[in-house]
């Protein structure tokens, strides 16, 4: 699986949450709980994934771009 993000979202997320996307995506190395965020029409399917990184609970919001790419939106 390939993970991508925009530089703007990366910097904003690092400033607000103090965790880099490279670290946050490690939740996918173990079990996750996921649900579709259907609160709004985003024009794409957004998924909340919750998992652990070094014992810390992390939530990652992503969208599937194709069969092998997840676009990280937020952590």
Feature map (PLM): residue ranges:
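Ribonuclease/tRNase effector modules and their secretory precursors
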Residues: 1-75
């Amino acid at each position: 699986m390939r993970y991508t993000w925009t530089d703007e979202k990366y910097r904003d997320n690092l400033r607000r949450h103090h965790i880099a996307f490279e670290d946050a995506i490690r939740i996918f190395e173990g079990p996750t709980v996921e649900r579709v965020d259907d609160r709004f029409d985003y024009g794409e399917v957004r998924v909340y994934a919750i998992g652990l990184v070094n014992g810390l609970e992390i939530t990652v919001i992503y969208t599937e771009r194709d069969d092998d790419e997840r676009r990280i939106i937020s952590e």
